[in-house]
């Protein structure tokens, strides 16, 4: 498996925080700031994992997750959003193909614990 990650969030410091964590784990990290960028970047770099915010401009993260899952049934997507506290968003995330969910804000241990679920 390649160790390439795509971090998708419209907030730059969140992308940086996740990027730092994943680079420590040996991942090459690419970034996107909205769902449309995420889809284009996914097609270009074929990441092994994707972290995805929900509420973003241009395209909602759940829609982008669904498009990515349609492109690649084996996609490993983790939703990182304050929205996952709401059961309906978690349900929609699962329907869109997400395999792990993390509520913001989070620390590195919480992130890695949830991230590991992508590989179960």
Residue ranges and their predicted role:
Residues 56:
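Receiver (REC) domain active-site loop signature in two-component systems and cognate sites
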Residues 80-81:
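Hydrophobic/aromatic residues positioned on beta-strands within the core alpha/beta folds
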Residues 43-45, 67-75, 96:
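Conserved phosphotransfer cores of two-component systems
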Residues 12-30, 96:
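Two-component/phosphorelay signaling modules centered on CheY-like receiver
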Residues 53:
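Active-site residues of response regulator receiver
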Residues 63, 84-102, 113:
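Alpha4 helix (beta4-alpha4-beta5 surface) of REC/receiver domains from two-component response regulators
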Residues 106-115, 119:
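C-terminal output helix
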Residues 34-37, 60-63:
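Acidic catalytic/metal-coordinating carboxylates
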